[in-house]
């Protein structure tokens, strides 16, 4: 029996719309615009104690001025500049803006715009029209999450990375190998956590994407080695720090283990259990890579990145923005997010709620630090179980000659755009 059934030859469906779009857009667009304005002009402009932008901007200014870039004292708890020389070279144009406030506001605005554009692309990838109410509702809901709010408040690059991820998924689905490879290569250059996503073009045999995904960060770093002042210190000073598991502001499993003093054997056991669930879920999802390409690509991406957040040496709650493409599969006929357990998980890794309690201060503090850990772990479990159920069910369905094939499960409820 084939591990990956061949999709039937059908024409691309027309983007979907709902009969409620007129009312939905009238409600959702004003809310989305007002929430975006508040997040930008109030929350982001005011900023917070945690400030990712100043660290990056200062390093880029050192690059422009010819001062060694990697000169920080890593035993302080301040945000540190951790980008490799190639990423420094890529981001260098930001350092040529000499006005700090202007540079910061522009950077925040670009990230906010990138989030909006990413949601538009994910709306289309999910099969819905941009004129439907899906896009503005998604934007409005995203503005309520911790990941979007803190990305803007801390002024980091996650909004741009989300757009790059959405473009990469579009390229995988539409077989645009070279563009997809360039985009994912740049994403890997900035954040190596995207490296496991090269699995997607590998199994789809999109060799151009795989080649560029590897060569892009290699070439940038090779060139930057001769251009970035003190580039060698990235290897001698920064990389050893990156290999450490810090015991503060760290929601990963290793971070939890070091915080609570978990025995090494127990940490390794949990690591292997969750790593195995991620791997088996990815293998089970392979069956749908041709029949349901967006569902497969987004769900595989989601479980791989969640595995990275949960199992790596550093996991921070706002990384959860990269799970948004997986959440968009809710709009399709098959999704992990059709299961209520996935939404319990989403609450823990997306909610901006704070946990304070005078009666249970320790429990409240643990929830502040590790709510994302709970959410990521739960999402891995529910994805693993769902993928196995789908895999077994699909094998049985394909083995039944009389089983009907439904080509449009939503035709009773939806209208098509002209």
UniProtKB/Swiss-Prot annotation:
It is found in: Cell membrane. It comes from the Bacteria. It is a multi-pass membrane protein. It catalyses: Adds an alpha-D-arabinofuranosyl group from trans,octacis-decaprenylphospho-beta-D-arabinofuranose at the 3-O-position of an alpha-(1->5)-arabinofuranan chain attached to a beta-(1->5)-galactofuranan chain. Its main location: membrane. The keyword Metal-binding does not apply. Its EC number is 2.4.2.47. One of its GO terms (biological process) is capsule polysaccharide biosynthetic process. Pathway: Cell wall biogenesis; cell wall polysaccharide biosynthesis. Disruption phenotype: Cells lacking this gene show reduced levels of cell wall-bound corynomycolic acid methyl esters (CMAMEs). The chain crosses the membrane at residues 25-45, 81-101, 102-122, 125-145, 153-173, 183-203, 210-230, 266-286, 293-312, 327-349, 372-392. Keywords: Cell membrane, Cell wall biogenesis/degradation, Glycosyltransferase, Membrane, Transferase, Transmembrane, Transmembrane helix. InterPro entries: GT87. One of its GO terms (cellular component) is plasma membrane. GO terms for molecular function: hexosyltransferase activity. Belongs to the glycosyltransferase 87 family. Involved in the biosynthesis of the arabinogalactan (AG) region of the mycolylarabinogalactan-peptidoglycan (mAGP) complex, an essential component of the corynebacterial cell wall. This is Alpha-(1->3)-arabinofuranosyltransferase. It comes from Corynebacterium glutamicum (strain ATCC 13032 / DSM 20300 / JCM 1318 / BCRC 11384 / CCUG 27702 / LMG 3730 / NBRC 12168 / NCIMB 10025 / NRRL B-2784 / 534). The lineage of its organism: Bacteria, Bacillati, Actinomycetota, Actinomycetes, Mycobacteriales.
């Amino acid at each position: 029996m084939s591990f990956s059934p061949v999709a039937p030859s059908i024409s691309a469906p027309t983007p979907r719309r709902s009969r409620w779009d007129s009312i939905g857009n009238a409600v959702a667009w004003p809310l989305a615009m007002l929430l975006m304005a508040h997040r930008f002009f109030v929350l982001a402009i005011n900023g917070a104690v945690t400030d990712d932008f100043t660290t990056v901007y200062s390093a880029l200014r050192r690059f422009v001025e010819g001062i060694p870039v990697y000169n920080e004292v890593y035993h302080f708890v301040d945000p540190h500049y951790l980008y490799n020389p190639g990423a420094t070279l890529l981001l260098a144009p930001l350092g040529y803006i000499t006005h700090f406030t202007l540079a910061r506001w522009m950077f925040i605005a670009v990230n906010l715009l990138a989030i909006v554009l990413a949601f538009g692309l994910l709306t289309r990838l999910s099969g819905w029209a941009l004129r439907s109410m899906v896009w503005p509702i998604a934007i409005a809901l995203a503005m309520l999450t911790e990941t979007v709010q803190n990305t803007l408040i801390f002024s980091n690059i996650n909004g741009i990375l989300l757009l790059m991820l959405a473009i990469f998924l579009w390229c995988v689905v539409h077989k645009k190998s070279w563009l997809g490879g360039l985009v994912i290569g740049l994403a890997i250059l900035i954040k190596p956590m995207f490296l496991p996503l090269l699995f997607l073009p590998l199994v789809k045999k999109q060799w151009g994407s795989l080649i560029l995904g590897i060569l892009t960060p290699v070439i940038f770093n090779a060139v930057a080695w001769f251009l970035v002042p003190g580039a060698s210190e990235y290897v001698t000073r920064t990389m050893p720090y990156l290999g450490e598991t810090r015991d503060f502001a760290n929601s990963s499993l290793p971070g939890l283990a070091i915080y609570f003093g978990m025995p090494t054997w127990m940490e390794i056991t949990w690591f292997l259990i969750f790593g195995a669930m991620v791997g088996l879920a990815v293998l089970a999802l392979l069956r749908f890579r041709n029949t349901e390409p967006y569902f497969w690509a987004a769900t595989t991406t989601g479980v791989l990145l969640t595995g990275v957040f949960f199992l790596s040496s550093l996991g921070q709650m706002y990384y959860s923005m990269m799970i948004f493409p997986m959440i968009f599969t809710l709009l399709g006929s098959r999704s992990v997010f059709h299961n209520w357990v996935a939404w319990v998980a989403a609450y823990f890794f997306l909610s901006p709620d704070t946990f304070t309690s005078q009666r249970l201060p320790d429990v409240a503090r643990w929830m502040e630090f590790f709510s994302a850990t709970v959410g990521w772990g739960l999402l891995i479990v529910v994805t693993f179980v769902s993928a196995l159920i789908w895999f077994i069910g699909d094998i049985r369905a394909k083995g039944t000659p009389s089983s009907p094939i439904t080509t449009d499960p939503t035709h009773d409820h939806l209208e098509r755009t002209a």
